[in-house]
Amino acid sequence: MKCLLLALGLALACAAQAIIVTQTMKGLDIQKVAGTWYSLAMAASDISLLDAQSAPLRVYVEELKPTPEGDLEILLQKWENGECAQKKIIAEKTKIPAVFKIDALNENKVLVLDTDYKKYLLFCMENSAEPEQSLACQCLVRTPEVDDEALEKFDKALKALPMHIRLSFNPTQLEEQCHV
């Protein structure tokens, strides 16, 4: 009985720890993700990360630019103080090709889950720091059109993650997301 209680206690302690994305893309070619992208869908572990137009992780990716050093420059737009602001984030390469380190938007990692390079890219931003662990993911597409295949892959990837809010955008919204 003592062993059962100990095992149960350990299981609960481990389950309450970090929100961890375990599946990232193998063999990411960072040069192939370069170019214009549109945020088709977003999801987050905490409703407050996306619920309002100016929510902390409600960002609209505009362009991905690999740097000569192998890092990834992310150009995005975000609502701040009632207007659209352009931001640039440098995601530093790590030993894992699909994982990047960032120090922006209160997040500390960008993880590429999947991409076909031509139509869609799925990624998550993770903050594993205590006590405010959080996870926000996006489905990016190359054109301002709804891509059902990309959305299916996004929904499949989210099944294993603790998401509590999900937003998706129609073609008009994709065109008008947040223009500077």
Swiss-Prot record:
Keywords: Disulfide bond, Milk protein, Retinol-binding, Secreted, Signal, Transport
Molecular function GO terms recorded: retinol binding
InterPro entries, per database record: Blactoglobulin, Calycin, Lipocalin, Lipocalin_CS, Lipocln_cytosolic_FA-bd_dom
Signal sequence, start to end: 1-18
Record Gene3D superfamilies: 2.40.128.20
A GO term from the CC aspect: extracellular region
UniProt subcellular location: Secreted
Entry superkingdom: Eukaryota
PTM annotation, UniProt: Alternate disulfide bonds occur in equal amounts.
Expression by tissue: Synthesized in mammary gland and secreted in milk.
Oligomeric and partner information: Under physiological conditions beta-lactoglobulin exists as an equilibrium mixture of monomeric and dimeric forms. Interaction with LMBR1L is controversial.
Family designation: Belongs to the calycin superfamily. Lipocalin family.
Protein name: Beta-lactoglobulin
Source organism of the structure: Bubalus bubalis
The gene coding this protein: LGB
